[in-house]
Curated annotation (Swiss-Prot):
Domain comment as written in the entry: The N-terminal domain is essential for RNAP assembly and basal transcription, whereas the C-terminal domain is involved in interaction with transcriptional regulators and with upstream promoter elements.
GO MF annotations, alphabetized: DNA binding; DNA-directed RNA polymerase activity; protein dimerization activity
Subcellular location: Plastid, Chloroplast
The keyword Glycosyltransferase is annotated on this UniProt entry: no
Keywords on record: Chloroplast, DNA-directed RNA polymerase, Nucleotidyltransferase, Plastid, Transcription, Transferase
Alpha N-terminal domain (alpha-NTD), as annotated region: 1-234
Description of how the protein assembles with itself and partners: In plastids the minimal PEP RNA polymerase catalytic core is composed of four subunits: alpha, beta, beta', and beta''. When a (nuclear-encoded) sigma factor is associated with the core the holoenzyme is formed, which can initiate transcription.
Known catalytic reactions: RNA(n) + a ribonucleoside 5'-triphosphate = RNA(n+1) + diphosphate
Role this protein plays: DNA-dependent RNA polymerase catalyzes the transcription of DNA into RNA using the four ribonucleoside triphosphates as substrates.
Protein name: DNA-directed RNA polymerase subunit alpha
Gene behind the chain: rpoA
Enzyme class name: transferase
Length: 353
């Protein structure tokens, strides 16, 4: 095993990129270091940066497709090898970059036979296609394929809502706006005794719509913007123009609050742990999010059998989740959910003392 060496600052806090590469048009990698840091600071920064990289950076996706010739999402069209559902899934995977604000329209209008790829998307000049070779459909006959598209810039993810009215031929598409595919941090300590310092290593993978260095800059700026209000003096006598922004709070006594907290503390704790804190691989994370599993509480309300019913979920994914639950929370997920959450939470609480 070759031991890696990096040159770091010993006095002034500095960051630098120690590795950068483009594995493909849709996969960029970058590794960065920040040093010197006092004990504990690297973990604080690493956790905050990972969450900002995954959740605070905006991306551009196709969020809707429209064609009057499509009877329903799971139909097949004469002369096209793929089903409508497969075409929608291919559109979902198209990587875009833009400085778009809100939404805009785009379209595909092509005559077969031939392959339909991302380069056939007609979009405004401020929307750029990262990889023109991404496959959309295969036309086996001389037919016309015309699809209207809606492109949106946002952050996080957008789960499509069921649409029972297909008369307009419009179909929503799940969107994962996050341009950062994954982010990890690790810490290296050096020095002796009270002189110990830390180096933060930050690894970033992006989808090609921006570089890891650009992602790091955007995430840092977004974090700074979130903390700026705390730098201003608190306005004690705040006058609102009207009452529409005031929120009445229930008059709980301290005793009532304490009793309620004791009664529900395990459930509250589980609700407060979001699955993006568990360092899940992006594919597993996105599958869980699409199934409305956002917190550890949501996850524990499912059995291993339930997880296997999730679309695109594999037995390896369940094993990865079991490993993370055991490693970080000392919790096991039952193969079948035979007891309700309250009993499960109570048993977890009893085991933890």
């Amino acid at each position: 095993m070759v031991q890696e060496k990096v040159r770091v600052s010993t006095r002034t806090l500095q960051w630098k990129c120690v590795e950068a590469r483009a594995d493909s048009k849709r996969l960029y990698y970058g590794r960065f270091i920040l040093s010197p840091l006092m004990k504990g600071q690297a973990d604080t920064i690493g956790i905050a940066m990972r969450r900002a990289l995954l959740g605070e950076i905006e991306g551009t996706c196709i969020t809707r497709a429209k064609s009057e010739k499509i009877p329903h999402e799971y139909s097949t069209l004469v002369g096209i090898q793929e089903s409508v559902h497969e075409i929608l899934m291919n559109l979902k995977e198209i990587i875009l970059k833009s400085n778009l604000y809100g939404t805009c329209d785009a379209s595909i209008c092509i005559r077969g036979p031939g392959y339909v790829t991302a380069q056939d998307i007609i979009s405004p000049p401020y929307v750029e296609i990262v990889d023109n070779t991404q496959h959309i459909a295969s036309l086996a006959e001389p037919i016309d394929l015309c699809i209207g598209l809606q492109i949106e810039r946002n952050r996080g993810y957008l789960i499509k809502t069921p649409n029972n009215n297909f008369q307009d031929g419009s179909y929503p598409i799940d969107a994962v706006f996050m341009p950062v595919r994954n982010a990890n941090h690790s810490i290296h300590s050096y020095g002796n005794g009270n002189e110990k310092q830390e180096i933060l290593f930050l690894e970033i993978w992006t989808n090609g719509s921006l570089t890891p260095k650009e992602a790091l800059h955007q995430a840092s700026r977004n974090l700074i913007d979130l903390f700026i209000p705390f730098l201003h003096t608190e306005e004690e006598n705040l006058h609102l123009a009207d009452n529409q922004h005031t929120v009445p709070l229930p008059p709980f006594t301290f005793h009532e609050k304490l009793t309620k907290l004791r009664k529900n503390k395990k459930k509250i704790a589980l609700k407060s742990i979001f699955i993006d804190q568990s360092e899940l691989p992006p594919r597993i994370y996105n599958c869980l999010i699409r199934s409305n599993i956002y917190t550890l509480l949501d996850l524990l309300n499912n059995s291993q059998e339930d997880l296997m019913k999730i679309e695109h979920f594999r037995i390896e994914d369940v094993k990865a989740i079991l490993g993370i639950l055991e490693k970080h929370f000392a919790i096991d997920l039952p193969k079948k959910l035979k007891i309700g959450f309250e009993s499960l939470a109570q048993s977890i609480y009893s085991e933890s003392g």
